[in-house]
Amino acid sequence: MSFSPTYSIVMASPLLTSSQMIPTTGSTVGFRSILPFGSLRLTRPYKKTSLFISYCSSVSKKAKTSATDLKPVVERWPEYIPNKLSDKNYVRVYDTTLRDGEQAPGAALTPPQKIEIALQLAKLRVDVMEVGFPVSSEEEFETIKTIAKTVGNEVDEETGYVPVISALARSIQRDIEAAWESVKYAKRPRVGIFTPTSDIHMKYKLQKTREEVIEMVASSVRFAKSLGCKDIQFGCEDAGRSEKEFLCKILGEAIKAGATAVNVADTVGINMPEEYGELVRYLKANTPGIDDIVFSVHCHNDLGVATANTIAGVCAGARQVEVTVNGIGERSGNAPLEEVVMALKCRGAYVMDGVYTRIDTRQIMATSKMVQEYTGLYVQPHKPIVGANCFVHESGVHQDGILKNRSTYEILSPEDVGVVKSQNSGIVLGKLSGRHAVKDRLKELGYELDDEKFNDIFSRFRDLTKQKKRITDADLKALVTTCGDEKLNGANGKESNGYVPVPQISSMV
C-alpha cells in the first residue's frame, strides 16, 4: 500500500519507523512503508503534494541504503480501559467469528478448531474476540473457558498485547452467569448482553412493553456488574429497525447501569450506509452518557453493504467495529474483517480523519484460509482482499501496467495481507493477455527469442487461447518447441517466482 499523497508523517525515529520488516521467503527480508499503524501516525496534510512526495522519496532512499540495519518497530500496547480509548482515532476490532460467524449454516466448529482459530485471531491482534454463547451447551461453556484460560492469558512480552475475551448472553440472569463464569479466567474478560429493541421483536419475541424492556436491560447490566464483571457491553438487536428516540433512552439506561460499551446492530442488514451513519450520529448526539463509553457497530450483509455500513458508522464516530473473518455469519453474513480493516488502513487517513487499527494485516490471509478450511465455507475467487483473483491480472492492458509498476492497477500490496508475490507473479495468461506479458513470461522461463520467432509463438498462443481459458508454463514451452530453434538465457534455465527451472535445451527441430 502506498502513502496517501496529501498527509505528513511524524516519526519517533526518521529511519527506524519509515519501514517495517516483512518476512518473505527463505532468508529474504522485504521492506515496505506501513501507514497509519505502529509509530507511523498521520497528522496534518502538506499544503503541497510535491513536498510530501519529495519527503517520502528521501525516506525510501534511506531505507534502501540502510536495509541491513533496520529492525522491526515494536510498540507497546496502550493500557486497556474498558470504556475509554487512548486515542480518539483508534478503532477497536471486535471479532465475532467464533460466535456470530459460527452461526452460518454448516459452519459448526469443534472445540479444538475454535481454540486454534482463537490463537490465530490473537496473532492477527484483534482487540476483542467474542468466542461463543456459553449457555447454549456444556461443550460451548467449557470451550470458552479454555480459550479464556489460554489465549486470554497469553500476554505478548514485547508489546503487552492480550485480547479481551467476550461471551454473549441474553438479558437473562442464567445467561449472564454462564457468560461470566466462562470468561472470568481471562486477563480481560467481557460479558456482552443483547436485547431486541425493535417494535416487531419486542412484540413477537419478548412480548413486553418498552418500559419492561428498559427495566430488563438495566437490571441485567447491574446483575453482571454485581458478579464482578467490569467490562460489560450492551447491544441493541435489530437497532436498524428501532425507533431512534427509544434507542437513546434504552442505551442511556444501560450506560447508567454500568455498561462500558454499547452496540447498535443492523441485525437484518436493512440499512443503507447513509441512514446507518445518520443513526450513529443521532445516537451519539442524543444519548445520555454516550461520551463515557465505547460506541460499537455491528452490520449484516443482507443487501451487500455491511462493509460500507460499518465504515459509515466509523465516519459517524463509532470506535469499535464488529466483524467476522471472510464475512461468515447468519444468512448473508457479517461485515468481513479483512474488508473493514483494509479499508481503514488504505483510506482511514485520507477520508476518515486519521482513524486506524492495530491489526497485523500480514496475518489476514493465513487467518482467512484457516477459517475456510475449518468451516468448509470457501470464498469466491473475486472476494475482496482474500479471493484467489485479488492480485491476478489477465487483461493485456492491465498486465502491461503491472509489469511496469504494480501500483498502476493494485491499490494494496499483496504482502500487506500476507501474500508474497514478485513483480509479475500475479500475471495470468489467457485470451486477453498482450504481447508484453507473454514475452516477459517466456523470458522468465529462460527463452530469448528474436522478433520473428516471437511473432510466430504469439500467433500460436492466440490460437491456443481459443481452446483453453488459461495458458500454463507447460503450454508456453510446448509452443516454443514447435516453433523451431530458440536461444536459452543460461545453461540451466532461470528459476523465477517458484517455477521449476527450464532444463537445458539444445536446438530443436
Swiss-Prot record:
**EC number, UniProt record:** 2.3.3.17
Q: Briefly describe activity regulation.
A: Inhibited by EDTA, Cu(2+) and Zn(2+).
User: Where does the record place it?
Assistant: Plastid, Chloroplast
One GO CC annotation, please? chloroplast
What this protein is reported to do is described as: Determines the side chain length of aliphatic glucosinolate structures. Involved in the biosynthesis of glucosinolate derivative natural products such as 6-(methylsulfinyl)hexylisothiocyanate (6-MSITC), a compound found in wasabi with diverse health-promoting properties. Catalyzes the conversion of 4-methylsulfanyl-2-oxobutanoate (4-MTOB) into 2-(2-methylsulfanyl)ethylmalate (2-(2-MT)EM).
Q: Which gene encodes it?
A: MAM1-1
Q: How does activity depend on pH?
A: Optimum pH is 8.
Q: Which SUPFAM superfamilies match?
A: Aldolase
**Protein name, per record:** Methylthioalkylmalate synthase 1-1, chloroplastic
Give me the reactions it catalyses.
Answer: 4-methylsulfanyl-2-oxobutanoate + acetyl-CoA + H2O = 2-(2-methylsulfanyl)ethylmalate + CoA + H(+)
The pathway it acts in is: Secondary metabolite biosynthesis
Q: Which InterPro entries match?
A: 2-IPM_HCS-like (IPR050073), AIPM/Hcit_synth_CS (IPR002034), Aldolase_TIM (IPR013785), LeuA/HCS_post-cat (IPR054691), PYR_CT (IPR000891)
PANTHER family cross-referenced by the UniProt entry: HOMOCITRATE SYNTHASE-RELATED (PTHR10277), METHYLTHIOALKYLMALATE SYNTHASE 1, CHLOROPLASTIC-RELATED (PTHR10277:SF60)
Q: What is known of its domains?
A: The N-terminal part of the protein controls substrate specificity.
The entry marks the following residues as binding Mn(2+), namely D100, H298, H300
Q: Which organism is it from?
A: Eutrema japonicum
What quaternary structure, including any partners, is listed in this protein's UniProt entry? Answer: Monomer.
